Structures are given as structure tokens and as C-alpha cells.
């Protein structure tokens, strides 16, 4: 308590007033003591770490004109360094001659028969439109002449002109229909273990509450028929991923799980992958395109878990680094190779698989 009372005396002191009352000698002493406390000046801004070096006494009077005259005289007295190879004035190489630009050919004036010249000179805009349509020369007349002739409604051949500017008619493409899955009804069917329900697709249904998605995960623990479960673009987050991870530890029927395009972080994705050793039925897992990147550490842990799993055949995620990407690809290739060997063993006999490296 006595130490705190001593500090109370210095609480209301004005540091600027104290520094302003110090002499130059006292300021230098204070600066030296601060240098001992902080030799690298890490507590000072970068612009204040260098000591003041402009307080030196001048060595003599400064006269600008005399200094310039001295520098000019010194520059004139200094001899230039002689060239190692003296310049003889000999010219080498070819003299550069600019290339002549090619002359544009002059178009000769076309002379028509007097009857044609007279006919064209006296032709109206509508007749010029007909001639342009027949010859296919639609630049023969300006737009103003064309629209004036079109307004006079005296053009005979309108198809030849209109067919050039007619736009291409594209077939209208309808928007994708919204997902018509009844969320509550599907949840009840999962809870009732409906044998006809083998695929649950809740993709792009954005108004599903988080407790409802967690209820889906709880219902899938006891379900024996659902093989595909997809919740792409449903705004699912980490609590949903944690519930799905607990479901994977119990469920023995689900084969495909798709949680792409959601708000699951690296912790949620890692919980899903850590549940794979407890599940022997899942063959496809898609986790790509989340709201935030997983990071290199999470990717390395995911690859380590994939290398220890022998049942997963497809893993949907684009690794950012080449090392984890190659390791995950090799793990999936080895798992598919094991499935192929088991299938051949059922047909021809047992085949002893090779040991997987790094497992």
C-alpha cells in the first residue's frame, strides 16, 4: 500500500513542464540514461531514433558566391582522364538510310457509260436502297438516306436490307427452379426410418434453421436407409459440422456426405475428417468452397487422417499447396486400388496388396 501511495504523488505531474525546465546539460544526461535503458530505441518512432548532429560549431563563415567560384575553378583545373584508345575520327559500318514508306495506290476514277451516270445522278433515295439491296453493298448510302427512303415507303426490295440488321433470336433460358424438398416432412421420414428414402437433398435452401440441421444429424444416427445426404449452400456452420461428425461415428449406412459452399471453419472440417476412422461406410466426402480458407496446418492434418483411412474413395476439396494435394491424391488412388483388388479377389482368388507407404 505504501508503494501505491508514493505513486499517487506523480499521477498529476506535467511531463512537458518538467522537460521544459531542464538545461541542455541535463537533457544530454537524461538522453544518455535513456540510451542505457533502451539501446536500440525500440520505444521511439523511427524518425526520432537518430541523434541530433546539427549542433556543431561552424568552422568558418559561409559565403555562397565564394563557394561557387571555388568549385568552378577547381572543376576547370581538374584534367579529364585520357582515353585508353584515342579517337581517330574513323567511321565504321554502314550509313543509316531511312526506308521509304510504300506509296498508297491511287484509285483511278471509274468511268461509266453516260446513260448509267445520268440514271445514278437522278436516282432517288428509294431507288438507291433497291440497288444497294440487289448488289449487297449496304454501305453505298448513309443511314440518314436509308431512313428517309424507308419512311417514304417506296422501297421495292426491303428484305435485302432488313435481313442484314436483324438480330439473332436466342431461346430464353428459364431460371433454375428452387428446391422443392419439404424440410419438416423429410425430417420426419428420417426419424421414422422410411425405407423408400435413400437420398436427402437440401441444397440451396437458405432458410433452414441451425437447430433443424442439427436435428437431421441426430436423426441420421438411427436411420438405416439414407445413403446420400447433401446440404450445399444452406448456411451451415461449425455446430452443424460437429453434429455431423458425431453422426458419422455412429452411422453405418451413409455413403455420400456433401457440405460444400457453407460457413464451416477449419475446426468444423477437422472434426468431420477426424470422425472418418470410426466410419466404414462413407465413400465420398465433399467439403470444398467454404466461406474462409482452412489454412496449411488444417490441410496437413486432413491429409494425415486421409492417409490412415482405407474406405474413403472420393474427397472433394482443392488443396492450396501442392504437397498436401499430391498426398491426398495418392491416398484416394490407393483406396480405389484396394477396392479393385478386392473385386478381383472375389472373382479369381485372394491377392495380397502392397503395403502403403507413410501409413
UniProtKB/Swiss-Prot annotation:
Q: Which domain of life is it from?
A: Eukaryota
Keywords recorded for this protein, A-Z = Actin-binding, Cytoplasm, Cytoskeleton
Q: Does the keyword Plastid apply?
A: no
GO MF terms here are:
actin binding; tropomyosin binding
List, alphabetically, the Pfam families matched: Tropomodulin
Reply yes or no: does the keyword Cytoplasm apply. Answer: yes
Q: Where is this region: Disordered?
A: 39-61
SUPFAM superfamilies for this protein: RNI-like
Q: How does it assemble?
A: Binds to the N-terminus of tropomyosin and to actin. Interacts with FLII.
UniProt similarity note: Belongs to the tropomodulin family.
Which protein are we looking at?
Tropomodulin-1
Name the source organism: Bos taurus (Bovine)
Organism placement in taxonomy: Eukaryota, Metazoa, Chordata, Craniata, Vertebrata
Q: Which gene encodes it?
A: TMOD1
Amino acid at each position: 500500500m505504501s508503494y501505491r501511495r508514493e505513486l499517487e504523488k506523480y499521477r498529476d505531474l506535467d511531463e512537458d513542464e518538467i522537460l521544459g525546465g531542464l538545461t541542455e546539460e541535463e537533457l544530454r544526461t537524461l538522453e544518455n540514461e535513456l540510451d542505457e535503458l533502451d539501446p536500440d530505441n525500440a520505444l521511439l518512432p523511427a524518425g526520432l531514433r537518430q541523434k541530433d548532429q546539427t549542433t556543431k560549431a561552424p568552422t568558418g563563415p559561409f559565403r555562397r558566391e565564394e563557394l561557387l567560384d571555388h568549385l568552378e575553378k577547381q572543376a576547370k583545373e581538374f584534367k579529364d582522364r585520357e582515353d585508353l584508345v584515342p579517337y581517330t575520327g574513323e567511321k565504321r559500318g554502314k550509313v543509316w538510310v531511312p526506308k521509304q514508306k510504300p506509296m498508297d495506290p491511287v484509285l483511278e476514277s471509274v468511268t461509266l457509260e453516260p446513260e448509267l451516270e445520268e440514271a445514278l445522278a437522278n436516282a432517288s433515295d428509294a431507288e438507291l436502297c433497291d440497288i444497294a439491296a440487289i448488289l449487297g453493298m449496304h454501305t453505298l448510302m448513309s443511314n440518314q438516306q436509308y431512313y428517309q427512303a424507308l419512311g417514304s415507303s417506296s422501297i421495292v426490295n426491303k428484305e435485302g436490307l432488313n435481313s442484314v440488321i436483324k438480330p439473332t433470336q436466342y431461346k430464353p433460358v428459364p431460371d433454375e427452379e428452387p428446391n422443392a424438398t419439404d424440410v419438416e416432412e423429410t425430417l420426419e421420414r428420417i426419424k421414422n426410418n422410411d425405407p423408400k428414402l435413400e437420398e436427402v437433398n437440401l441444397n440451396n435452401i437458405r432458410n433452414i434453421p441451425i437447430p433443424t440441421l442439427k436435428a437431421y444429424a441426430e436423426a441420421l444416427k438411427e436411420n438405416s436407409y439414407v445413403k446420400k445426404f447433401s446440404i450445399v449452400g444452406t448456411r451451415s456452420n461449425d455446430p452443424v459440422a460437429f453434429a455431423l461428425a458425431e453422426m458419422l461415428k455412429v452411422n453405418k449406412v451413409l455413403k455420400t456426405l456433401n457440405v460444400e459452399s457453407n460457413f464451416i471453419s477449419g475446426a468444423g472440417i477437422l472434426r468431420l475428417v477426424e470422425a472418418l476412422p470410426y466410419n466404414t461406410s462413407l465413400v465420398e466426402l465433399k467439403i470444398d468452397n467454404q466461406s474462409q480458407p482452412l489454412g496449411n496446418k488444417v490441410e496437413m492434418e486432413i491429409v494425415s487422417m486421409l492417409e490412415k483411412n482405407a474406405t474413403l474413395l472420393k474427397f472433394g476439396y482443392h488443396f492450396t499447396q501442392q504437397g498436401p494435394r499430391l498426398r491426398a491424391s495418392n491416398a484416394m488412388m490407393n483406396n480405389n486400388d484396394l477396392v479393385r483388388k478386392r473385386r478381383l479377389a472375389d472373382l479369381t482368388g485372394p491377392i495380397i496388396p502392397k503395403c502403403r507407404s507413410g501409413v
